[in-house]
Amino acid sequence: MATGQLFSRNTQALFYNYKQLPIQRMLDFDFLCGRETPSVAGIINPGSEGFQKLFFGQEEIAIPVHAAIEAACAAHPTADVFINFASFRSAAASSMAALKQPTIKVVAIIAEGVPESDTKQLIAYARANNKVIIGPATVGGVQAGAFKIGDTAGTIDNIIQCKLYRPGSVGFVSKSGGMSNEMYNTIARVTDGIYEGIAIGGDVFPGSTLSDHILRFNNIPQIKMVVVLGELGGRDEYSLVEAMKQGKVTKPVVAWVSGTCARLFKSEVQFGHAGAKSGGEMESAQAKNQALQDAGATVPTSFEALEVAIKETFDKLVEEGKVSPIKEVTPPQIPEDLSSAIKSGKVRAPTHIISTISDDRGEEPCYAGVPMSSIIEQGYGVGDVISLLWFKRSLPRYCTKFIEICIMLCADHGPCVSGAHNTIVTARAGKDLVSSLVSGLLTIGPRFGGAIDDAARYFKDACDRNLTPYEFVEGMKKKGIRVPGIGHRIKSRDNRDKRVELLQKFARSNFPAVKYMEYAVQVETYTLSKANNLVLNVDGAIGSLFLDLLAGSGMFTKQEIDEIVQIGYLNGLFVLARSIGLIGHTFDQKRLKQPLYRHPWEDVLYTK
C-alpha cells in the first residue's frame, strides 16, 4: 500500500445508500474548509434516480442520484472515493462492485458485521489492484481542511473545536471511530492539530491496517509526527513494530494500546469491537505497548498520560525547528438549519399552511380533535367522519345518517349519464383509475350533479324573503336563469324520482323541521303547472333538505350556514358519492376487457 496522500481539497466521493445527515455534514465541512466544489459528486441509491437537494454553505445544490454504481462512476469520472453506507448484508457486494471500477481508488465501508469471508475477498482484490479499503466497521477518516468521510469527527462544533478546518502536523490512526473523535480533540489541545486521521475499523480483518496508514504518513511531508491508538486483540500492532525496527518509519510515533484492564478479568473479555477481545499474551495490551516501546515509539504509562506524551513529542519538534507555526484562520460561520433554529428558539418563522380539521402529530391522527381509535371504538360511520372533517363537529345521528343516505342514493345513476359515459370512454382507452375517475368528475357542473349548491342558495334566499313560488320562479325567468334543482330529462309528474321520495320520507320522519323542503315542494307544484317534467330533482331535494339539516340541528349559526352554502359543501357531497360509481364503472370496463370506444357514425348528424 504505502504511497502517500489519499485525499486532497479536490477529492470527490460517490455516496452509496442515501443518508441525508452524513452527506450534509460532509458538505458543511467542505464549506468550513473553504472548498470551492462539494466533496460529494453523486449519490447511488439502487432503484432510484434524480436529484437530492442539500446545502453547500448558504445555497442549495442538487446532487445527482444514480441507480447503479457503474452509471455513477461513468457520470463522475473524477470521483475516486466510494463511501459505502450499505447494511452489512449488502456492503460486500456493493464494495466489490466499486473496487472493480477503474475510477475508484478508496472504498470506505461503514457497516459493522460484514461476514469475514467477504471481507477477506475484498482485501485480496484491493491489494492486488492497488486500492485502499477503510473499514469495515469504521466511521471513516478525515484530511484536515480538505476532505472527510461521512460522520467522521461528528458535529460542526466538534470539528471547529478540533481545528479540523485547517491542516496540522500530526498523522493519527486508530481502530475505534469513537475514540478517534476524542483524540482529534486531545491532539488539537496540545499540538497544531492533525493533518490526517483514519479509523481503520474494529472488525477482526480491517481492509487496511494501522501500519499501512502509518507508512503512508511517513511519505507525507506535511506530517511531522504520528499518533497511534490501538486496542487489545489481534496482532495488527506488531506489523507496525516490525516496520519501525526496519527503519521504515522515521517520524516520531506516540502510541497507546487500550485494554490494559483486561488482566483484571479471569476469563476472556470482549471490548465492543469484534477484534477487541483478550486472547493470548501476545494479543494483550501490555505486550503490544511494550513491543511498541521497544521498537522506539513513545508509550505512556497510562491512557491518561497519552496527552502529555503527545505534547512533549510535539514541543520537541518545535524546538528542533521541524514544525513551523501554523497561521490560524477563522472558519466561516455555517448557517444554521431553519428547523434547528426554530427548535432552539433562536428564530421564528411563519407557517405556510393552516389546518383545522385534522392533526397527525401525535401517536394517532385526530379528526377535528377526535382520535382515530375513538372513531373506531365508538362505531362512527362515514357520515360521522364527514361531519368531523367537513363541519368540524359531531352532528346528531339523524344528520350523519342523512349524509350517508345521500351518498348511497347518488353513488351511481347508470352508464348513460355524462359522468359515467366519460369515465367508461376513458377506461376503454386504457387509462388508469385516477384518469378515468377524474374524466367523469369533470362533467359535474350546473347541468349534471353540480346544481345542489345553487338550488340551496336560491331556495334559501327565496324562502327567507318569503317569496311566493310564483314570485320566485317568474323572477328567475325574467333574469334568464333556470331554477336549479327543478327539472329532469327522464322523470316527470307521473314518474317521480325514487331518490327524491326516499330523501323526503326520511326527512319528514327524522328532521325537527323541513321548512326549506316544503318550500321546494311548493315551487315544484308551481313549475309542474308549466311542464310535466319540471319536477323537483335529486339536486333540489338534497339542497333544500341540507338547509333544513343545518338549520334544524341547532349547531350552526346563520352566518355559518350562509358560508357552507357559499363555499360549495353540498356539491362536494355529490362529488364524493358519484366517485363510488365512477370507480365502479372503471373497474367494470377493465374487468370486461372492453376495447377502445368509437362513437357510431349513424349517431352523428353531419351538417354544414
From Swiss-Prot:
GO terms for biological process: acetyl-CoA biosynthetic process; lipid metabolic process. InterPro entries: Cit_synth/succinyl-CoA_lig_AS, Citrate_synth-like_lrg_a-sub, Citrate_synth-like_sm_a-sub, Citrate_synthase, Citrate_synthase_sf, Citrt_syn/SCS-alpha_CS, NAD(P)-bd_dom_sf, Succ-CoA_synthase_bsu_CS. CoA binds at residues 292-302. Its EC number is 2.3.3.8. Mg(2+) binds at residue 231. Signal peptide: none annotated. Keywords: Acyltransferase, ATP-binding, Cytoplasm, Lipid biosynthesis, Lipid metabolism, Magnesium, Metal-binding, Nucleotide-binding, Transferase. One of its GO terms (molecular function) is metal ion binding. It is an enzyme of class 2 (transferase). It comes from the Eukaryota. The keyword Cytoplasm applies. ATP binds at residues 214-234, 265-291. GO terms for cellular component: ATP-dependent citrate lyase complex; cytosol. Its main location: cytoplasm. The active site is at residue 273. It catalyses: oxaloacetate + acetyl-CoA + ADP + phosphate = citrate + ATP + CoA. It is found in: Cytoplasm, Cytosol. ATP citrate-lyase is the primary enzyme responsible for the synthesis of cytosolic acetyl-CoA, used for the elongation of fatty acids and biosynthesis of isoprenoids, flavonoids and malonated derivatives. May supply substrate to the cytosolic acetyl-CoA carboxylase, which generates the malonyl-CoA used for the synthesis of a multitude of compounds, including very long chain fatty acids and flavonoids. Required for normal growth and development and elongation of C18 fatty acids to C20 to C24 fatty acids in seeds. Heterooctamer of 4 alpha and 4 beta chains. Belongs to the succinate/malate CoA ligase alpha subunit family. This is ATP-citrate synthase beta chain protein 1.
